[in-house]
Amino acid sequence: MLTKKKITLLDPDTWDDKNDSWFLDIYTEEKKLQKTLALCMTRKNETYHHWSVFTSRENGVCIVFDYDKLVAHLNRQKGIIHGLVRYMTLDKMRKNNIDIDELPFLKRYAFTDETEYRIIYPSTENISVKNISLPVDAIKKISINPWAPKTL
């Protein structure tokens, strides 16, 4: 990210939560796309939950972005959509008439604590990766995993 000045969106089929990838599969199908790629972030401060769920025990970094700079940059990227995730119970999802354009930003209520922000690339091509330029000044802070081995 620092050397290439890019962030990478990947195929959600690799996600653990198959409900999330299912919503994106439906979105892709309904929009007649070949692929929808995504990157998930959080608006929440660094927590134990994030380190324990999204990294292996000793690996990983936490990158804090300047929200306004990141959003302004994403707004200038052709074909990119982004926004906060909306959380709903499965019962509410069944009862509400959900607009197809909401699907990339919809998640089960049980995950509300994640306060997720998503960057989405709907593609008419069958690609597995989408790199987006990233201005380095949008990065405010980088933290190393607290369980990373100590240097010698």
Over which residues does each language-model region extend?
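Partner-binding and oligomerization surfaces adjacent to conserved cores of proteins
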Residues: 1-152
